[in-house]
Amino acid sequence: MKILFLTDNFPPEVNAPATRTYEHCKEWVKQGEEVTVITCTPNFPQGKVYTGYRNRLYQKEIMDGIRVIRIWRYITANEGFLKRTLDYISFSVTSFFAGLFQQADIIIATSPQFFTALSGRTLSFWKRKPWIMEVRDLWPESIKTVGAMKENPIIRFLEWEEKRCYRSAKKIIVVTDSFKKRLSEKGIPLQKIEVIKNGVNRELFTPMSKDQVLLEQLDLKDKKIIGYIGTHGMAHKLDFILECAAGMEGKNNFHFLFLGTGAEKNKLLKLKDDLGIKNVTMLDPVSKQDVKRYISILDVALINLRKSNLFTTVIPSKIFENAGMEIPILMGVDGEARQIVESYKAGLCFEPESKEDFERQLDRLLSDPVLYEQCKAGCRKLAHDFDRKVLAGQMLNIIKETK
């Protein structure tokens, strides 16, 4: 079977969409399928082309058996709504034209970004092939939630296009049960929607001893390290975490480590300086292979989203990689994500944006050795049940049935 997959994020980018697509496609190739990925020159999240690549009109490479086609797009940093929209639209257009010349039995387009789904839908029409829409975020609803854009004619147009995509797709694959419920409420038949959650590559993310060399380099030996590793975006409300850190300075030898970048990174660096806090280290992102070293030195893996009803429907992918390395989780997200962490006893949850509850749960997690070991065991069970290989196989079965 020839699978054509459209995504605007792909390795060597290291964000969750790139990782999910790559690990799924790699498994499908191992199972004998022909997979072509149309993507762009790696540039996320800083909008700078990675070393060794150029933003050319068309270039090909083979990655673990996956045929990867990289096409030109207007590249900008992950900040500023208008520029990012132009970025997304340019990829939608060039990926469509590139896709016209690829053989395919089925087309998959992943959203966000939503304009990638529009390209998939249009290709399906012109090539007379079925298409699957993968929904990893409820876009454009999430734009309004984070305050990037208020209700206006553009949003209403995008919502209209969103419904057209849902109707035209032969199958919709979502990443949470809550998304399935939300789409059903929009009038999408339940039998059209399948759930394939995120997971962990258990060959890559396995328990390891703390990296002593890294601890020495960061001058964090003998510290209790609470770490946030991932995108520093509008949805993640990391200013709240910095304010919590400021209120806990000098307490219990706690130190907060931030690793990553995103639209809010510069604001967060300025806030750190304005608050004058010394118990926070903020670093730029590293490769997927190197990120294991940073996870290894954590005592607690921090996961946070702003307080919103929409975010009760999401499951941050950070849960799974941290669980794979058996790092107990402290999470400020309600809804389905909280149900997973608490049901597996993989960590503790605090009320989103509550400083008092954040401090209370953090103290509880790091002051009770029995609880801490229980959380490590819960992480182990969680990682076992969300094995990316198994999930990739389940998604491939859906693709075969859809074809």
Identify the function of each model-found stretch:
Residues 4, 220-236, 241-245, 257, ...:
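Conserved donor-binding/catalytic core segment of Leloir-type glycosyltransferases
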Residues 236, 287-294, 299-323, 329-340:
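Nucleotide-sugar-dependent
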Residues 253, 259-260, 265-293:
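Nucleotide-activated donor-binding/catalytic signature segment of Leloir-type glycosyltransferases, i.e.
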